[in-house]
Amino acid sequence: GGNTECFWKYCV
């Protein structure tokens, strides 16, 4: 937890 940008199932 603590991601800022998520695309589909990939979070960075």
Swiss-Prot record:
Record flagged with keyword Disulfide bond: yes
UniProt keyword annotation of Phosphoprotein present: no
Subcellular location: Secreted
UniProt main location, coarse: secreted
Pfam families (alphabetical): Urotensin_II (PF02083)
A single cellular component GO annotation: extracellular region
Role of this protein: Urotensin is found in the teleost caudal neurosecretory system. It has a suggested role in osmoregulation and as a corticotropin-releasing factor.
Descriptive protein name: Urotensin II-beta
Organism from which the protein derives: Cyprinus carpio
